[in-house]
Design a protein with these regions (language model features):
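Sec-dependent N-terminal signal peptides
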Residues: 3-11
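Active-/binding-site microenvironments in catalytic and ligand-binding cores
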Residues: 13-252
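C-terminal end-of-chain detector
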Residues: 2-3, 252
């Protein structure tokens, strides 16, 4: 199966892809999946999971989920009135060069750290100007806490949004990235805005420019600062404000 997948992806990029270079940046959806504290969460029911009277095996079920939970995409409409809904995000923006900015050292010292414009320009000084069409991911190191809600969010109390503490991105840094022409911005925490945010200014900046967000991104530490290619495959929900995404990286 991995070989077949590699060949299919390779066909899209004009060459065969070594399956060992494909990194899945997606957490599975299950009872442990982390959502915003006031969300319903993921529900999965096995309607039938057995051998039929006719002798053949049959498995089917149903699931329900909030749009924003687990590894997911924020469509621009999420915080931008009149902006793109989930199904309207152009396919051309669902693949692109990955840029990984590591702020894990600062986040380890301050749970509420927010990536700054200086973090972005320091990255560019070392690795080069962020190209138009890039998808920028911020590595905070928060994946080490998944799926332990209290450590990951700062609170594990259902409905409690007043005591959240995790790293995010300053709106000024988001503005700088928008000026670079990026198509998506993601992070390995529950939100591109930090935990204590009440106005979600970073979401507003990105949404107003039709830049999508990626949240709860898994295993960012497996990617190099530059050189990888991202494939972003969200569930195609009409008029969706967001939804589950299968996020893959092709290593250089």
């Amino acid at each position: 199966m991995r070989l077949v997948f590699g060949l299919l992806v390779g066909a899209c990029f004009g060459q065969a892809i070594d399956p060992a270079k494909v990194v899945d940046l997606t957490y599975p959806y299950n009872k442990d999946t982390i959502y915003w504290p006031n969300a319903q969460g993921f529900q999965h029911r096995k309607d039938m999971w057995k051998r039929t009277p006719q002798g053949y095996w049959y498995a089917a079920g149903e699931f329900s989920t909030d749009e924003h939970g687990g590894t997911h995409m924020d469509a621009p409409i999420h915080f931008g009135e009149g902006k793109l809904t989930l199904e309207a995000v152009p396919v051309s923006k669902l693949t692109g060069p990955a840029v990984v900015i590591d702020i894990s050292a600062a986040a380890a010292k301050d749970r509420d750290y927010r990536a700054t414009p200086a973090d972005v320009t320091a990255f560019e000084a070392k690795y080069g100007h962020i190209r138009k069409g890039s998808i920028v991911l911020f590595r905070t190191g928060w994946g080490k806490f998944w799926p332990r809600r209290k450590e990951y969010l700062g609170s594990d109390v259902p409905g409690d949004t007043a005591h959240l503490h995790f790293p995010g991105i300053l709106p000024e840094a988001a503005t700088l990235l928008v000026s670079r022409g990026v198509v998506g911005v993601g992070i390995d925490t529950a939100s591109n805005d930090y935990g204590p945010s009440v106005k979600f200014e970073t979401h507003q900046v990105l949404s107003e420019s039709n830049v999508y967000g990626l949240e709860n991104v898994a295993f960012i530490e497996r990617l190099p600062p530059t050189g990888a290619t991202l494939i972003v495959a969200p569930m195609k929900i009409e008029n969706g404000t967001g939804g589950p995404v299968r996020l893959l990286a092709i290593l250089p």
